[in-house]
Amino acid sequence: TTTWRSLQSEGSYGMNLWLDNQGVYINDFPADHYYSQYSTAPAEVPAYGDSVWVGSWPDGGDTMPGDLKGDGYGNGSFPHSKGRFMGRFALERHGNGINVGFVDGHTERVSVQGLWMLNWHKENVPNPNIELR
């Protein structure tokens, strides 16, 4: 199995949904985490990145997924709950790195562990202690 699978509804890249303060799920997450518009987000906020889904609400407190290959579809390990959303970006692509595009337009290759150090939302607390499983 590969992280480049082809289910109809999955993504190859996913949006940082903390930048979508008009989305249908806005009431499911703390309002103070969202940016009101891209222009108010600092340059180091990720806008999108390699992902197994079209979007996510990553947080520095999320757990490291046990599956970095994207095999979680249909077996209960798909990262679709609070505390697990970073797993949509945490993949074995590009030598355990993820291509991330930031709100100012620049791109970077970020290590899987480095995802936990990014400022995904306004109240995010980076986690330098995350480890690969």
Task: Name these PLM-found stretches.
Residues 1-133:
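Short, well-structured segments within or immediately adjacent to enzyme catalytic domains
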